[in-house]
Amino acid sequence: MNKSRYVFFILACLFGLYVQAQNRTVKGRVLSAEDKEPLIGATVKIPGTSIGVVTDIDGNFSLEVPDKDKTLVIEFLGMSTLTAKIPANGVLNVSLHPDTQRLDEVVVTGYGNFSKSSFTGSANTLRGDLLKNVPVVSVEQKLQGMTPGVSISGNSGQPGANQSIRIRGMGSFNASKEPLFVIDGVPVTSGSLSGGSADAAYMNNSKTNIMSTLNPSDIENITVIKDAAAASLYGSRAANGVILITTKKGTKGRAKATLKMDGGFSNAAVEFRPTLNGEQRRELIYEGLMNFQQDEIAKNPEAGLASPTEYADLHINDYASIPELGYTDWRKELMRTAHHQSYEASVSGGNDKTTFYSSLGFNRQEGLVENSNLDRYAARLNVTQKVGSRGEVGANVMFSQLNQEMNEERGSSINPFLCVALNTTPSFSVRDAEGNYVGSYPSSNVNPLRDIRTDYNRTRMTRMFSTGYASIDIIKGLKLKETLSYDYNIQKDSRYWNPLSGAGAKSGSDAQTAKGFIEYSKLISSTSLGYNTTIAQLHHVDALVAYEIENYQTDKAMGDKSKLPSDYLVEPDNAASLNSFVSSTQDSRMISYVSRINYDYDDRYYIAGSFRRDGSSRLSPENRWGNFWSVSGMWNVGAEKFMQSIKSVLSDLKIRASYGVNGNQPGALYGYMGLYSYGQNYMGGGGSYESALPNPNLKWEKNYNLNLGLDLAFINRIFVSLEYYNRDTKDLLYNRPISSTTGFQNYLGNLGQLNNRGWELELRTINFAGNNFNWTSVLNMTHNKNKIVSLDGKLDQSIEGSWFIHKVWLPYSTFYVKEYAGVDPQTGKALYYMNTQDANGNYDRTVTTDASAAQAIPYKSVDPKISGGFTNIVNYKWFDLALTLTYSLGGYSFDKTGTYNETDGAKEQNYNLPIYELDRWQKPGDVTDVPRFVLGQAAGPQNSSRYVHSTDHLRVKNLTLGFTLPDQWLTKLGVSKARLYFSGSNLLTWAKWDQYDPEVPVSGEVFCETPPMRTYSFGIEVSF
């Protein structure tokens, strides 16, 4: 017996030695390819087995591997899985790249996070690292072309100017059309602080974008919610979709410090409204004078008038003189190469109990014109702390300050800068012979260069946004959470006009000064109870109930004065004459009850529902409460057994559907009340007047949203998402016209119905995936059709302004113009289609030179037929490339500026003219669309389709090229990562109409806006 044991012991030892001889130890380290930081908890395993280890806090691992195994599989959440060959020396160091598809799988809704595979609604998530190097100030601009269904329009190219965002079309007449912004689960203020200071048209009329206060480098990801499945949770604020921003948090592990610096320059993205030079304009004016005299002689052949040549020689210097100092190139004088610079630092880290992320940043962006600048100072601190085994507290604090200088724009300004700059002729000199600024010109009464150097329009916006929360796990799966947030903004505006500028001239050639502020605060309290459980490993339930209170307050005031004793004493207190002073204080409140429940069976069948009840102080007690809800479901067909046989080809298939109701409350805080305004002078004393009619029947505007979705994946490399949506907006908030005998033109009420329907396509392909080379492409495409379904039941159309119409069954933004038919080749006169209608509604297509006889008709729309973007992301060893193209087809714009300087001689005596006047008609037989130029002739119609132009375009929107220095270069420096990069925006543009930028304001009306910038940026990012 003892002998048997002895033999067995010897055999066991020999077998152990044999096994040991067949194994080897593989050691190594797993890092992130992005920042060269260690990946803690990455799995390193032998293929086809469960044998493996996880990396430690430094990313290191050690694994016993049989000799027969030649490779290892390395996996980490959010990273591409890597299969690596084991080196002969047994040391395997690898870097994992982000997996775009997997990183986008988490959908953050603000009322819970869901994996993309289980989300029943319509949402797109973008990683912050894809956006951080895009060289623009505002977060919204970074989204352009990155997700289907989202349209972003710049109202101005000046730094920090407000942006307009539409998600799946325009869904309201008078209520807000902008989406709700949510930062770290809390709704925040976005857009502009309405009306600048106290609604003065000339105070900050380009409007500072509040979202420019946010440092994009602090963003972890952005989720865009487009349907009712998740948006209904936000009720009355989510009628136009939701944009959820999640900021960066600290992670467990050693502290990481990152420094980032970049700088560069910008110019106009397109050759903005090219005009004639001095000689070209003089030649055109001379021709126009001759044509005028020819027409006069033809009318009065016996009058003995001077010949056309004599007449033109006599008057040419009245309109196109040759300056003593030479012609002025106003673009060269006024426009500049703008420069920008940015400095950012962040530190993050944590342990088992505490995590933190902190950052500081400074950005300076110059505009294309002097006195157009933006400085941003931003700081952030995000902290989480575990309390015991079940509790957690946290705080997110942001502080930011914007210092902005802007030039006046558009027609609402007293002195819109670009209108003046474009219209001032080369015959006008900037300075006289003594070097002094010329005071004014016949075209505008101002010298634009002098004005931008002596006038100013300054805004300082300070924002503090803080959120604190505390949560506790009452029992397993049941969590109670309390969140309190405070969003505070104060904007201070100051203006000064020299005595000869627009406002100064209007006050009697006296300098004018103005000052104002608007203070805005929002306090939100949210208490929620959530429950999450799994039953029998098949049934998953996730439910939540919440109670929220939102309190909103504004305080604003503005005054302007004139008669200053000196141009150096510009404080309003130094001025003798008070021109105006306005002020207001407003507040509103909303109380909400929120609930949702999600259920799925075996990760195959999903159903979800939500209900929210909002009570708003902006509506009467009878209509104060609104109910908003959604139901949604999904069938994960790819998880069914009958699909497994084709899984290698059709790797995923999901069918989604949702339906629900969102709401929109009035923008006016007291829209249902009758209002009186006081402070009026009545017989030497105080007085008042009725300023708004009451409407106790005012109620919620509601959106009814249907969404159908289909998700497909082929061979785990081609991913297709196709969605159809239908959005009906009913009880539209609208200023209803009433009889002028009431003393009012309109009052706020509910009427009509608006519809948006369309489809979205997103195609994502993994073109190549390997150890050294990865290439991913994403194409997105959107088609949206907007139409008015009904107005008030009595009228089927309403003429809006000079060239828009709201008509049933047509898009909201439809032009209403006389249809231009080109130029008569024999006479050079402009032609128009008659477009009178017979009893059957057919249009008479006869052409006429009498514009007054032609009828205006609905003509084309602002809305494009197709729009989208195409992004490519390439990684090769130490190089990375990201390229985004944007495109738009089928949309149109109206050139209001053309109604001033494209009138064929009617208004151009003292204006400059567009370059396409070189293509004008000059002799019989000329075929062109630019009529004969006759100086001083009667003006044609302003509401002409001649000024309607296509916005079709393709643009290289963003390009980033980076080089990450190899590890062996950095080891001795104590640096974990160093990356050099170039980034650019709006680098190339191909447009069907190239006289101004094709990315026009959301209204479709183009008039004296600063064009967007083409930006080149060079930077370095270093991590320690």
How should each PLM-predicted stretch be described?
Residues 631, 657, 722, 761, ...:
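Hydrophobic, well-ordered secondary-structure elements that form the walls
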Residues 261, 360-366, 607-616, 767:
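Transmembrane beta-strand segments that form the barrel wall of outer-membrane beta-barrel proteins
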Residues 631-634, 760-763, 963, 1012-1024:
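Outer-membrane beta-barrel "beta-signal"
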